[in-house]
Amino acid sequence: MLLFGLLVAGVADGCDLVPRHLRGRRASGSAGAAASPSAAAAGERQALLTDPCMSLSPPCFTEEDRFSLEALQTIHKQMDDDKDGGIEVDESDEFIREDMKYKDATNKHSHLHREDKHITVEDLWKQWKTSEVHNWTLEDTLQWLIEFVELPQYEKNFRDNNVKGTTLPRIAVHETSFMISQLKISDRSHRQKLQLKALDVVLFGPLTRPPHNWMKDFILTISIVIGVGGCWFAYTQNKTSKEHVAKMMKDLESLQTAEQSLMDLQERLEKAQEENRTVAVEKQNLERKMMDEINYAKEEACRLRELREGAECELSRRQYAEQELEQVRMALKKAEKEFELRSSWSVPDALQKWLQLTHEVEVQYYNIKRQNAEMQLAIAKDEAEKIKKKRSTVFGTLHVAHSSSLDEVDHKILEAKKALSELTTCLRERLFRWQQIEKICGFQIAHNSGLPSLTSSLYSDHSWVVMPRVSIPPYPIAGGVDDLDEDTPPIVPQFPGTVAKPAGSLARSSSLCRSRRSIVPSSPQSQRAQLPAHAPLAAHPRHPHHPQHPQHSLPSPDPDILSVSSCPALYRNEEEEEAIYFTAEKQWEVPDTASECDSLNSSSGRKPSPPSSLEMYQTLSSRKISRDELSLEDSSRGESPVTADVSRGSPECVGLTETKSMIFSPASRVYNGILEKSCSMHQLSSGIPVPHPRHTSCSSAGNDSKPVQEASNVSRVSSIPHDLCHNGEKSKKPSKIKSLFKKKSK
């Protein structure tokens, strides 16, 4: 087509068909040569000048070029708003943005104008003739229709009408007759879309696709994979964190339930203490009222006695005597009832204070446990609140999911829950135990004057350094006495002891319930001191020439109070020191009876202690007790040695001697950095109570001497020869403390 146009242009030049600016020159030059042209040639030249196709460069000769020129003229009119024959930059920009609906028209605008700021129809025609779209074939047009316009359903219509690149200007101006009748595009939206696409390629050239960038595709694929993986990981971590948080909330709820139960128990404890105080006040009122009635009965009896003495008539005296007797009987019945109430639990008055002191010390330990449990609870709540605050943000959720804080908080919550459950169990057990003790004893323990008052009243007679239990916990020492030989100071203090109760007080006591602290093994010297006058002194051949040193036994009332004694130590020779052995019979590990520290260290895996002599005596029946009394009475009348009394005693008495013959191993403890050793040192107490039947009637006055005899018999049974205590121990090796005591005596 281009070659054909050039040939036509050359023929036109040969036929004097030249442009207007050359045509004027040629006409002026040929005016003198040809003065009279023919009329036919002049008419033909005038027709060429009036035809617009011939006035353009390159000219148009075909019908398609004429249709294209008309379409371009229509487009030029649409773009030329001011009708000045040229398209300015503003007009083209407005047309591109409003009519063609392009938002970013920079590239299109520069491609249309290039260097020309004023575009005429001739410029538009030249641009179209030199465009690549003008030379499109049918296949190129169909490819443009399918790929860019995306209307493949009209491919057959384009092929039937042989739509090529030269036909696109007609489509660009939306020629209705051509698009509907020939191309058969009835859909208005399709016609509008096809018009815009055709106008785009006519004005701006063919659309070009950028080269396919495989690197971008690879990066995009990797990004998609990473994004999907990250979303899946975040989903799983969020799900896991939600499960952890749900579990943690469940633990918190259980923790709150335990805390509420603890508060309820504390309220019950306060109510019980208030009831105990009320009961104590009522009891005091009843006792006061009873004493008033008894005093009134006594006064009435005295008045009747005076009336009987002052009466002259024997009958009146008898009546007065009967009335007095009746009053005395009533007073006696009341006194017997009161005596039964008071004698049902015949314990020393100091026991109530000691039990109150024990209760207060236990309450202090409970308060420490409670403070620790509350501290653990507060820490767990703070950690849970921190995790809740962190989960409010996206990065906080990821941080919580990746870190181990959830496991740590879960562990802390479980520890706090465990501590609260242990505290609740301890509180219930303590309440029940002290209620049972108060019920059995019959006096108040939980309601007392306080720990300072009890301590000052109980330890006022001794020069002891009182240290509270709560401030410094005990530190148990692993190992036995042999491990402490190198750390033991060369001087072992001997504590002053309390004198055992006389036999009369033992006889009047009707209860066998005594504190374990009062049962302290007595020394052989104290046994010999309590022997009767007829007892042979040859029972101790190993100490013939040494004076009898009185030994004192001191029951430690408090295992955590360090006692400092000013009593001088006892001096023994080498023969006496050889008799000191620290052994234990069979598998029993007997703790020190003067210390209660074993109860604090019971979790270290110690074996249970053997039964004491008091527990042995409590298991006796009433018939065995009566048989023991008879045997002890018979032995007290005879002149046989002490060994005969032991042989004639009951098997329970033999068990008692075997129990008393055991040598207790010392229990070593470290308290506040100071080593405190409490050694038994053969300090066996002779004040073991012997059970005897309690007499409820006061009429039998002839039995007053019997308890005295029984007490003396008990002292005789307890004073067993020293050799019998060591028959089973001569083959055992002494410990290292023996050598230490030898060095001290030297």
UniProtKB/Swiss-Prot annotation:
A Pfam family reported for this protein in Swiss-Prot or TrEMBL: SAM_2
Residues exposed to the Extracellular side: 15-218
Residues annotated to bind Ca(2+): D80, D82, D84, E91
Ranges of biased composition (kind: Basic and acidic residues): 625-637, 723-732
Alphabetical list of InterPro entries matching this protein: SAM, SAM/pointed_sf, SOAR, STIM, STIM2_SAM
Subcellular localization, as worded in the UniProt entry: Endoplasmic reticulum membrane
Biased composition (Low complexity): 527-539
Signal peptide: 1-14
Entry coiled-coil feature ranges: 247-394
SUPFAM superfamilies xrefs: SAM/Pointed domain
Annotated transmembrane regions: 219-235
Record topology, Cytoplasmic segments: 236-746
Glycan attachment points: N135
Topology class, membrane: Single-pass type I membrane protein
PTM text: Glycosylated.
Keyword list, A-Z: Calcium, Calcium transport, Coiled coil, Endoplasmic reticulum, Glycoprotein, Ion transport, Membrane, Metal-binding, Phosphoprotein, Signal, Transmembrane, Transmembrane helix, Transport
Keyword Cytoplasm: no
Biased composition (Basic residues): 540-549, 733-746
CDD domains to which the protein is assigned, alphabetical: SAM_STIM2, SOAR
GO cellular component, one term: endoplasmic reticulum
Gene Ontology terms: biological process: activation of store-operated calcium channel activity; intracellular calcium ion homeostasis; positive regulation of calcium ion transport
Record domain SAM: where: 136-204
Function: Plays a role in mediating store-operated Ca(2+) entry (SOCE), a Ca(2+) influx following depletion of intracellular Ca(2+) stores. Functions as a highly sensitive Ca(2+) sensor in the endoplasmic reticulum which activates both store-operated and store-independent Ca(2+)-influx. Regulates basal cytosolic and endoplasmic reticulum Ca(2+) concentrations. Upon mild variations of the endoplasmic reticulum Ca(2+) concentration, translocates from the endoplasmic reticulum to the plasma membrane where it probably activates the Ca(2+) release-activated Ca(2+) (CRAC) channels ORAI1, ORAI2 and ORAI3.
Quaternary organization: Oligomer with STIM1. Interacts with ORAI1.
Name recorded for this polypeptide: Stromal interaction molecule 2
Organism of provenance: Mus musculus
Gene of this entry: Stim2
